[in-house]
Amino acid sequence: MIISEANRKEICKYLFKEGVCFAKKDFNLAKHPLIDVPNLQVIKLMQSFKSKEYVRETFAWMHYYWFLTNEGIEFLRTYLNLPSDVVPATLKKSAKPGGRPFGGPPGDRSRGPRHEGGDRPRFGDRDGYRAGPRAGGEFGGEKGGAPADYQPSFQGSGRGFGRGAGGYSAAAPSGSGLP
């Protein structure tokens, strides 16, 4: 497919900047949602890059996803005349959130109010959510179940779902009362 040089550069700039690209599998879509070029041109250029192993393709839920490979990074770097210190966003280290530190000496910070025994209770306030004693005795009480004279028995290979014997044309088992 013939793709104009301006559209080709736009797609390549976006792919190099982000390191990934996606497109909905809709060949009639007028414009790609993030790049100002027709969706079909994005798909066809990425198919070309895939055959040259510049990108790796994944398809899920009617969307194509392309991930830039090392060879693709080198190709786009020369194609777009970029210096070697410019890298795609997928290769940049993300800044760690400035939350609380995980480690450190045990006496660094307060652990909340102390309880009798010198330490926090193991499970906190969970007792407030637990149910109290039940009618049949302590926790648990009498269990309701089958009556004492109940005798479960296996009924054999009757007609039913699952791994039954035979199919539609199989004869009914004897004593089942079925024709």
UniProtKB/Swiss-Prot annotation:
One of its GO terms (molecular function) is structural constituent of ribosome. Coiled coil: none annotated. Residues 145-156, 168-179 have a biased composition (Low complexity). InterPro entries: Plectin_eS10_N, Ribosomal_eS10, WH-like_DNA-bd_sf. Pfam families: S10_plectin. It comes from the Eukaryota. Gene3D superfamilies: Winged helix-like DNA-binding domain superfamily/Winged helix DNA-binding domain. Residues 108-129 have a biased composition (Basic and acidic residues). Residues 134-144, 157-167 have a biased composition (Gly residues). Residues 90-179 are annotated as: Disordered. GO terms for cellular component: cytosolic ribosome; cytosolic small ribosomal subunit; plant-type cell wall; plastid. It is found in: Cytoplasm. Keywords: Cytoplasm, Ribonucleoprotein, Ribosomal protein. PANTHER family: 40S RIBOSOMAL PROTEIN S10 (PTHR12146), SMALL RIBOSOMAL SUBUNIT PROTEIN ES10X (PTHR12146:SF27). Belongs to the eukaryotic ribosomal protein eS10 family. This is Small ribosomal subunit protein eS10x.
